[in-house]
């Protein structure tokens, strides 16, 4: 039992004695939490007046602080969260702010430019507020207990701020990738793609069907990725939805290749690209599926114009396909991120 107790104290860093001091003092002052929360917030702004700029409801307000209608509910929310997290810290073994709320706190603090020194200000304001509320109970051990509890919550928020920062870096990387798309597509590659497309586009209807049929010859399980084929007993060539879908995909791929150098980027409209990313993510498309479509595209074009086909033309079409695939993958990554965020925001049962 004693060993378990030591393990718990080591992992949480919050002792039984600290827990008792925090609980005792919170019980003595929580009935007055409305007034204390306002005092706490006013103290923050007295210690660090520029911090006012971090709150949207205070930034451009000319109303005296105590008359601002949004201050009290916000102050109450922050003060209660801080104190109740402290009270639950040892029992729960962790900061008890709900994960989705903690994530939101991290994102908000990161967005508003909160720094480590701001957490030191809230810590000072919290300790002074509690000391003034219960001077007869205040002494160094209690101060240390509340400071430790505050730091635990601050560290949890900082961890989420770092996550928000990393996600922004990732998003910027995707944007840079998208902005640089097309820059490595040479004039020679463009000429080869345009020349070959002009030679085959009048036959694009037949080629698109051939393109799609070959996908399922190489990778039969890929059929399961398409709702209109998944549960269909109709022969592939008789499926009424196959032809328009095949035409749409084949034309988009080829026309995107033709426009790639001129536009400097994949020319699928942003909304369609976003939809493509979401659909591909939802359907479970993987990197290997893009390799299949690349192989099939190259084989289809090669068979359509064998007399023009060359290694240089193969490389040009391969590069154009990869640029489109990378743009779709970037949107799939965003869709995955949005999905994870939605899952985390759902309350656990």
From Swiss-Prot:
Heme b 2 binds at residues 227, 241, 245, 275, 279-280. Heme b 1 binds at residues 56, 70, 74, 104, 108-109. One of its GO terms (molecular function) is oxygen binding. Keywords: Cytoplasm, Heme, Iron, Metal-binding, Nucleus, Oxidoreductase, Oxygen transport, Transport. It holds the Pfam family Globin. It is found in: Cytoplasm; Nucleus. The keyword Metal-binding applies. InterPro entries: Globin (IPR000971), Globin-like_sf (IPR009050), Globin/Proto (IPR012292), Leghaemoglobin-like (IPR001032), Leghaemoglobin_Fe_BS (IPR019824). Binds 2 heme groups per subunit. It catalyses: Fe(III)-heme b-[protein] + nitric oxide + H2O = Fe(II)-heme b-[protein] + nitrite + 2 H(+). Its cofactor is heme b. Residues 13-162, 184-333 form the Globin domain. The keyword Transferase does not apply. One of its GO terms (cellular component) is cytoplasm. Its EC number is 1.7.2.-. Induction: Regulated by nitric oxide (NO), particularly during nodulation mediated by Sinorhizobium meliloti inoculation. Belongs to the plant globin family. Phytoglobin that regulates the fine tuning of nitric oxide (NO) concentration in the cytosol in response to sudden changes in O(2) availability, and performs both symbiotic and nonsymbiotic functions. Exhibits NO dioxygenase activity in the presence of O(2) but nitrite reductase (NiR) activity in the absence of O(2) (e.g. during flooding or in waterlogged soil). May not function as an oxygen storage or transport protein. This is Anaerobic nitrite reductase Glb1-3.
């Amino acid at each position: 039992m004693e060993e378990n107790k030591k393990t718990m104290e080591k992992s949480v860093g919050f002792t039984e004695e600290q827990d008792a001091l925090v609980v005792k003092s919170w019980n003595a002052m929580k009935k007055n939490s409305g007034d204390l929360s306002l005092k706490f917030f006013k103290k923050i702004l007295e210690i660090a007046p520029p911090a006012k700029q971090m709150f949207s409801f205070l930034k451009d307000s000319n109303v005296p602080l105590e008359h601002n209608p949004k201050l009290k509910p916000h102050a109450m929310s922050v003060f209660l969260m801080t104190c109740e997290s402290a009270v639950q810290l040892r029992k729960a073994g962790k900061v008890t702010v709900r994960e989705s709320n903690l994530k939101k706190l991290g994102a908000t603090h990161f967005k508003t430019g909160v720094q480590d020194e701001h957490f030191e200000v809230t810590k000072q304001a919290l300790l002074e507020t509690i000391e003034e509320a219960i001077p007869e109970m205040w002494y160094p051990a209690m101060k240390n207990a509340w400071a430790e509890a505050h730091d635990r919550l601050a560290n949890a928020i900082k961890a989420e701020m770092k996550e928000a920062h990393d996600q922004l870096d990732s998003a910027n990387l995707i944007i840079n990738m998208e902005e640089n798309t097309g820059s490595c597509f040479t004039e020679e590659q463009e000429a080869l793609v345009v020349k070959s497309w002009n030679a085959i586009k009048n036959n694009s209807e037949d080629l698109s069907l051939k393109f799609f049929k070959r996908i399922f010859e190489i990778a039969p399980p890929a059929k399961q990725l398409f709702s209109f084929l998944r549960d269909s007993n109709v022969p592939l060539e008789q499926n009424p939805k196959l032809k328009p879908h095949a035409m749409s995909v084949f034309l988009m791929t080829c026309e995107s290749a033709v426009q790639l150098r001129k536009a400097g980027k994949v020319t699928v409209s942003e909304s369609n690209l976003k939809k493509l990313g979401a659909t591909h993510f939802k359907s479970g498309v993987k990197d290997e599926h893009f390799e299949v479509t690349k192989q099939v595209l190259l084989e289809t074009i090669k068979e359509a114009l064998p007399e023009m086909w060359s290694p240089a033309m193969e490389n040009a079409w391969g590069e154009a396909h990869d640029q489109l695939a990378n743009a779709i993958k970037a949107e799939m990554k965003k869709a995955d991120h949005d999905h994870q965020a939605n899952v985390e925001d759902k309350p656990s049962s």
